[in-house]
Amino acid sequence: MTSPMVVGVDGSESSLRAVDWAADEAARHGVPLRIVHAYRWYRYEGTALARELGKPSEHVTSEDILTVATRRARRHHADLSVTTEAVPEEPEYVLLREARNASAVIMGTRGRGELTDLLLGSVSLTVATEAHCPVVVIRGDHDNRAADGRHGRIVVGVADAPTAAVRFAYEEARRRGAALDAVRA
């Protein structure tokens, strides 16, 4: 793989756990990491300037989110090639566009309780069903750093014909000695 791994961030702890996993995987595969923050506040709040910076306030927030995510990615992989971008657009559209040139798209979930922990959010679901590359959704509130021997199970959705997602899941399960569950709806 030479295409970057793309991770979507929103400033939540869940998205930062996705950054941990994505950075580990990008380093393991020897590919760059691209961190993307999509924001849509400007449509609802208008554009307010951050007085001292001369920038719209949503840009300051995006820059902060990307700075924290980049520091987190480099915490364990100082030499990892990392690029970032803040895009004033709906997250699902941004991530689907990024998926065209990505080796994989990684994102967290924002579950708020036992029931919501079982469900994917609308962005995760949209990207997972429409992306043209493998999509990894990092779930849970534990350490999600990608380490060999710590993956018990990898789950992939399958269709009628083999897809990039199936090949990706098979290869990752093989590398890690993990069980591979194929699910068909």
Question: Predicted regions: what is each one?
Answer:
Residues 107-126, 130, 149-151:
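Glycine-rich, Arg-bearing micro-motifs that act as flexible, cationic patches
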Residues 1, 14, 71-105:
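Structural beta-alpha unit
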Residues 108-109, 135-140:
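Short beta-strand elements of ligand-binding domains
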Residues 1-52, 151-185:
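Small/aliphatic-rich secondary-structure junction motif
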Residues 53-64:
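A short acidic, glycine-rich active-site loop
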Residues 141-150:
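A short, basic/flexible loop-to-alpha-helix module at the beginning of a structural domain
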